[in-house]
Amino acid sequence: QFHDAVKSNVAGRLDEVKDLIEEIEKRAEAMCIQERLYREGKLKKRTNHCDTKVNNMMFDAETDKVLCVIDLDTVMPGFVLSDIGDFIRTGANTGAEDDENLDNVNVNMDIFKAYTRGYMEKAKSFLTPTEIKLLPYGGRLLTYMQTVRFLTDYINGDTYYKIHSPKHNLIRTKAQFKLLQSLEAHAGEMDAFMSEWL
């Protein structure tokens, strides 16, 4: 869809987003690791929620502990990296998904570490070393994918996501891309943190 949107440029917005398109294209090959490893038999599909953003979790009002996961209509076979990645994208972001002030948008490493530590307490027994090693990549992948989705919709004239202003999808794109850059900048620290379970 992204390449079709760029090719057709139906809303005439291509010129203002060429720099973002270049950044997406530059990362495209690196974002195919999950599928490549699956084809090579090094990564398997599991039962996944497939929409593990923070607002699909119910929290206890007094303790802030997670009570349960909701929105179960999305459960299907998928990759652990995607489920982890969407939580990192939404839960460890210091800004809003559509934050206009990009200075607000970064990865909160304390949240990343706390979430990962809690997840690994339960998941270490069944995850493969490849999955464990690639959990931080899942955050980058899902943030990249959401950047592409918002940008594609902006190029197409805002036909998929509900918008609240004419530039809303562009604002979302830039905020997600800033988060991606922050995740990339912290990749070494995240990878080192994961070595505790390898």
Model-flagged regions — what are they?
Residues 24, 115, 134-135:
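A structural signal for short hydrophobic/aromatic patches embedded in well-ordered alpha helices
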Residues 77, 81-124, 141-160:
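Active-site activation/catalytic loop segments of kinase-like enzymes and analogous catalytic loops
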Residues 1-49, 54-68, 141, 159-165, ...:
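ATP-dependent phospho-/nucleotidyl transfer catalytic cores
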Residues 127-139:
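All-alpha amphipathic helical-bundle segments outside canonical DNA-binding/catalytic cores
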Residues 52-54, 111, 126:
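Active-site capping/gating regions of soluble enzymes
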Residues 53-56, 86, 149, 179:
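Hydrophobic side chains within alpha-helical segments
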Residues 129, 149-153, 159-189:
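Short linear sequence signals and composition-biased patches located at protein termini or domain-edge surfaces
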Residues 70-75:
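Activation of the activation-loop gatekeeper triad in protein kinase-fold domains
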